[in-house]
Amino acid sequence: MSELEQLRQEAEQLRNQIQDARKACNDATLVQITSNMDSVGRIQMRTRRTLRGHLAKIYAMHWGYDSRLLVSASQDGKLIIWDSYTTNKMHAIPLRSSWVMTCAYAPSGNYVACGGLDNICSIYNLKTREGNVRVSRELPGHTGYLSCCRFLDDGQIITSSGDTTCALWDIETGQQTTTFTGHSGDVMSLSLSPDLKTFVSGACDASSKLWDIRDGMCRQSFTGHISDINAVSFFPSGYAFATGSDDATCRLFDLRADQELLLYSHDNIICGITSVAFSKSGRLLLAGYDDFNCSVWDALKGGRAGVLAGHDNRVSCLGVTDDGMAVATGSWDSFLRIWN
């Protein structure tokens, strides 16, 4: 037996020991604890608005913190800022690269960011004196595509990339202030904790990791998926997070229990998950799928509570407003739909 093979076996044994130690601490399952809770019943949501304007696949969307404006990014090379109440376009921003994969709205509402196969995170100022939108900063540094970005504030943004790293940037200087390394596959998604001190990442190594923004360290790693993790989203309390994967399952991981609590899957679902988001209370988990639908899961009991059907192609992105009153889904059919 080669030395490498021996080390592989030892690592596998250690992994199993860790799994066993976690299970030993697990005095009850979430299903047991929630067994006497009422189910959420049938969740039926309607499309209240359809946002038409993109001319090609929509790849990403992100709500503004006012729960009214949202930004979307499309293969047509446009970033559009929408008023979800009126369906009006506030801004249509032409991008230098049409291969955009992610977009983000700053908490202040002053900036939006985007990036993709250009490996650059571009920051746009929406509140210029002249009234026009322009690039205020470009952040080059990743050696792979930009898969996700999220603002901490107007001065800092976190990005994840196909180069297997995440990075914290000082927007003013354009420099990476912290690099988060540890994944062994493309990092596909990130989600900031409510207190903005940590974030979780999901990657093509089928693992998700919790990172400390303050010191750049990986605090916890979570495994269980058997394929790429495409999406991650923090539970509103900040003590748990959900993941969505190409293995056709979503999973709920608890930071304090240090393990998986629940698996969301259905015999009829055999396609990958592109996006996940919790309702404001955390009781519902919404997940977008390659089969054109969006499933609504009972986050605590694990059952499927509803389906949002209406898109004519893959649901590529979704988001719940800060006030919890609406869900937006974006699709390869070039439309965004607002549901509640």
Curated annotation (Swiss-Prot):
WD repeats lie at residues 53-92, 95-134, 141-179, 182-221, 224-263, 268-307, 310-339. Gene3D superfamilies: YVTN repeat-like/Quinoprotein amine dehydrogenase (2.130.10.10). Keywords: Acetylation, Phosphoprotein, Repeat, Transducer, WD repeat. One of its GO terms (molecular function) is signaling receptor complex adaptor activity. The modification N-acetylserine is found at S2. The keyword Phosphoprotein applies. One of its GO terms (biological process) is G protein-coupled receptor signaling pathway. The modification Phosphoserine is found at S2. The modification Phosphohistidine is found at H266. Widely expressed in the brain. Highest levels found in the hippocampus and layers v and vi of the neocortex. It holds the Pfam family WD40_Gbeta. G proteins are composed of 3 units, alpha, beta and gamma. Guanine nucleotide-binding proteins (G proteins) are involved as a modulator or transducer in various transmembrane signaling systems. The beta and gamma chains are required for the GTPase activity, for replacement of GDP by GTP, and for G protein-effector interaction. Belongs to the WD repeat G protein beta family. This is Guanine nucleotide-binding protein subunit beta-4. The gene is Gnb4.
